[in-house]
Amino acid sequence: EQPMAAAIGADLPINEPVGNMVIDIGGGTTETAVISLGGIVALGAVRVGSFDIDAAIQAHVRREHGLAIGERTAEEIKKSIGSAMPTPRERDAEVRGRDLVSGLPKTVILTPQEIREAIDEVVTQMVDSVVRCLAVAPPELSQDFLTRGMYLVGGGSMLRGLAQRIERDTKVPVNMSPQPLEAVVLGAGHCVENFSALRGMFMDSRR
């Protein structure tokens, strides 16, 4: 499963008797897994990801500014001024698209605050999924989460302020993977190279 591969890619001690919590935010899903002794002991998933953030930005710009923009422009807005929480030195962004009334090119100014509000519903669904997974995790692993923190991977994890938002709402420290985009791929590659040794773990990753 992807969370297991992400945990391996993040070099977490998945075979040790400690709780490892991984949050993998991809394009269409957010998966949260608690891994201990080589198995997944709690798993949560919700069908929202970074693509849904882009769609929310598109819908907001269309509804509030009468402007049609493409997926690539929405992604650029997310990267330039999108955030899950207020951040230092925020700046407005100039965005170009097609006026829905005249059909002509049009430029509007977007603020970080309005984009934050536009994507808040999606971000909240992501965070709530993490909260639910924490709630069903074995209680004896709670101390591990508090001392070692959770690990955030996946392209969607790069949204500014998301780690801080999860930490605020769960009261559990959040660590960003040094290679959030590559964690799953690195883990999958390690699994292929060591398939014989890891086969049993993946055959029974849900305990």
Regions found by a protein language model. Give the residues of each.
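Conserved phosphate-binding catalytic cores of ATP/NTP-utilizing and phosphoryl-transfer enzymes
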Residues: 1-23, 189-193
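Conserved phosphate-binding/catalytic loops in two-lobed NTP-binding clefts
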Residues: 164-190, 198, 205
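Acidic, glycine/GT-rich loop-and beta-edge segments that sit at the periphery of enzyme/chaperone cores
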Residues: 70, 89, 190-207
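Phosphate/ATP-binding catalytic cores across multiple sugar-kinase/actin-like superfamilies
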Residues: 3, 118-146, 191-194
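Phosphate-binding glycine-rich/basic clefts of nucleotide- and phosphate-handling proteins
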Residues: 37-120, 135, 145
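A short acidic Gly-Thr/Ser loop motif
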Residues: 22-29, 35-39, 49-51, 130, ...
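Glycine-rich phosphate-binding loops at beta-strand->alpha-helix junctions
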Residues: 86, 142-166
